[in-house]
């Protein structure tokens, strides 16, 4: 256990610092950490969430190459997937796979622009902790939502 801290429910956020964390590095080292957050009332746990996550540095070269912790991810290793159940990404996180999530179907089922915005927001926030997701991909006819995705998740590139 790296840390065990209690903070009041009124605290808007809590920051925990890790010293020399092991980076999630794809198949080489798919190291995951776990955050357990609970709501304790009068000493009894009323609600709890267990959230595995990985730490990694992600960047993109001017030629379009994706780098994880400074190493190029070969195009053949990047799995293009339509939006999936979070359990799919859990498995990818654990086995060190790399994903580019195509959001086309999510955009297609939206009733209107506001619905699309809401669906994209929910999906990105729900899956932003997965280190296996390296990028989001929007259909070209929904490129105007790129700014929203970048605002929600500034750590990943948005592709078209």
Task: Give the residues covered by each predicted segment.
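Secreted/periplasmic carbohydrate-active enzymes, especially glycoside hydrolases
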Residues: 1-101, 114-160
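Short gly/pro/ser/thr-enriched loop/turn and capping motifs at secondary-structure boundaries
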Residues: 106-110
């Amino acid at each position: 256990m790296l840390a065990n801290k209690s903070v009041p429910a009124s605290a808007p956020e809590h920051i925990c610092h890790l010293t020399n964390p092991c980076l999630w590095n794809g198949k080489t080292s798919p190291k995951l950490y776990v955050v357990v957050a609970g709501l304790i009332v009068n000493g009894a746990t009323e609600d709890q969430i267990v959230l595995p996550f990985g730490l990694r540095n992600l960047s993109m070269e001017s030629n379009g190459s994706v780098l994880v912790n400074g190493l190029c991810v070969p195009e053949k290793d990047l799995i293009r997937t339509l939006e999936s159940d979070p359990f799919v990404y859990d498995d990818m996180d654990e086995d060190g796979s790399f994903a580019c999530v195509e959001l086309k179907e999510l955009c297609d089922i939206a009733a209107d622009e506001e619905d699309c915005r809401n669906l994209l927001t929910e999906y990105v926030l729900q899956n932003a902790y997965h280190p296996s997701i390296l990028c989001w991909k929007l259909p070209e006819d929904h490129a105007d939502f790129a700014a929203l995705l970048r605002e929600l998740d500034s750590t990943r590139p948005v592709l078209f």
